[in-house]
Amino acid sequence: MALVPGRSKEDGLWTRNSPGSSQHPESPRLPNPLWDRGKIGKVEGHQHIQVSTSSACVWQLAYPPVWPNLPAVPIQDFSQKSHLPSIVVESSEVNEESGDLHLPHEELLLLTDGEEEDAEAFFQDQSEEPGWAWSPQDPRSPLRTFNAGLSWGQDQDEEDACWILEDTACLEATNHCPFWDSTGSRVCRSGFVEYSHLLPPNSFEGAEEEAVQTPAGVESGAASEAPGGRGCDRPRADHAAPPQEAGVQCTCQHYTVREEAQKTPPADPACPEREDSHGSGSPFKASQD
């Protein structure tokens, strides 16, 4: 801030024609704006004037003793700048020949609150289209990327084959093994785990029926030979599993049942029908019993 100090009373009155007066033509002091507002005086190295450029707006105040009752008035406004917010983008490359600056490849995008919400809603709607998935790691697009496994010409069934549905859906199983009959078999798919219940092969249908009928014959024989409630400790036929479940279980234990049938079980006086059911006992013993 620059100030123009006035003279003290000891120096005498400050008249207009005195050499120290601001209205004197040879005076180095600044003119008073109350007399001449159109002129802008020049300051040329006066010892009582100090100029400071620390602030953006510089004022000069004068306290002349001629008007002791007047308040301090501004003389001159050197600069008054309005600071606007700006965005500075540093250049990545400089062409030495032409001197052109190459800006970075990243685009600078400024969105207001309303535009940001609209853009977010737009990308969410686009992500629900078939063939699009969220992928923030894709350098081409920060929000979505196209699934290369799908094409726009494919049907909905082919799309379901690539994407696992959230709801549990039963689909027909493919024939993975040539000797297995996949007709009537179903595969229940839930999430990423497949649960398959396949029917036994056609070549083992006769052996399966024999294995299923064997426990029923044993139970009937045990019921006839033990009227008093004594007999083999085996589960009853009415409490057995359904035919389909029994068939699935016998498929897993098919070879085990055949191996047990080939072996000769020990003689059990309480269950003589075991030898007849498996066919491993001698006919003479069976007739005596």
Curated annotation (Swiss-Prot):
GO CC, any one term: nucleus
InterPro entries with a match to the protein in the record: LBH_dom, LBH_dom_prot
Boundaries of every LBH domain copy: 1-128
Tissue: Expressed in bladder cancer tissues (at protein level).
Pfam families in the record: Lbh
Record's compositionally biased regions (Polar residues): 15-25
Residue segments, region Disordered: 1-36, 205-289
GO biological process: positive regulation of DNA-templated transcription
Official protein name in the record: LBH domain-containing protein 1
Species whose genome carries this gene: Homo sapiens
